[in-house]
A protein has these predicted regions:
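Transmembrane-embedded, aromatic-rich helix segments that form part
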Residues: 188-201
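Transmembrane-helix signature of polytopic, membrane-embedded enzymes
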Residues: 8-9, 91-129, 164-171
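Membrane-interface alpha helices of multi-pass inner-membrane proteins
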Residues: 41-44, 124, 172-185
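Short hydrophobic/aromatic helix or loop-helix immediately within or flanking a transmembrane segment
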Residues: 42-74, 78-82, 89
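Transmembrane-helix motifs of polytopic, lipid-linked glycan transferases
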Residues: 12, 78-108, 152-156
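Aromatic- and kink-enriched transmembrane "portal" helix at the membrane-lumen/periplasm boundary
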Residues: 69-77, 102-113, 120-147, 180-190
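Start-transfer (signal-anchor) and selected internal transmembrane alpha helices
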Residues: 1-21, 86, 108-121, 211-213
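Membrane-interface transmembrane helices that cradle and orient dolichyl/undecaprenyl
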Residues: 110-114, 150-173, 180, 199-210
Length: 213
């Protein structure tokens, strides 16, 4: 069986299982706490508590406008459902790359493909069913969308690490910088990835010396 096909099947499976899980358990209307504020701010495109979340409100507004059925609160909650489903897909992609790095080689045989990709799927689904992650994936809060930016940045960091010796590798760093800036329109959490990015670039491209550090 083709290794790329196995990889794609498992990746799609991770996304589908996550999406179905959260779609079946999403809050049917407006949840408690800040969710009500974000739901109201989304519908009327107003400003929630500082520092605000303009990008989240605009994306959630699209769900409110274009989902043809359901309670307005439910529509906005679906923003987090889609965000968390894509996070689980990225967790799968990140995990199998970590395993390949530990192996010191790419997957070569069908047996290795099933072992590596299957293990990555288990890891992704374990994260999918964890309590805190699940809790944030079924309500109109910014955390799911913020975590999506973090997961995407980590994935791009791994892609850059793979391509760091090839021409054009800077495009990954530029995209990461853009996403970090964009993510501040959702939550400030993604700024923490800057420290990991700096360490990655340093250890990948420079000799480890007290002066250079």
């Amino acid at each position: 069986m083709d290794k790329k096909l196995i990889n794609r099947i498992f990746a799609i499976l991770a996304f589908v299982v996550s999406f179905i899980t959260y779609a079946l358990t999403v809050q049917p209307s407006v949840p408690f706490w800040d969710c009500g504020e974000f739901s109201g701010a989304t519908v009327w495109q107003q400003v929630p508590h500082p520092p605000g979340a303009p990008l989240f409100l605009m994306v959630a507004k699209l769900f409110h406008l274009f989902l043809p059925f359901g309670d307005p609160g439910w529509k906005i909650n679906m923003t987090s459902v889609f965000a968390d489903a894509f996070i689980i897909l990225l967790v799968y992609l990140i995990t199998y790359r970590i395993i390949e790095n530990l192996m010191g080689k790419k997957v070569e045989t069908t047996y290795e493909a099933i072992s590596v990709y299957g293990s990555s799927l288990v890891a992704a689904l374990a994260f999918n069913f964890s309590d805190t992650f699940w809790f944030n994936g079924v309500e109109s809060e910014v955390y799911a969308s913020s975590n999506l930016f973090v997961a995407l940045i980590i994935y791009l960091m791994m892609r850059w690490n793979e391509e760091a010796d090839n021409p054009g590798h800077e495009k990954y760093l530029l995209l990461i910088a853009y996403l970090i800036g964009l993510s501040t329109g959702v939550h400030l959490l993604s700024i923490l990835t800057i420290f990991s990015l700096v360490y990655l670039v340093y250890f990948r491209k420079y000799q480890i010396k007290p002066v250079s550090f």
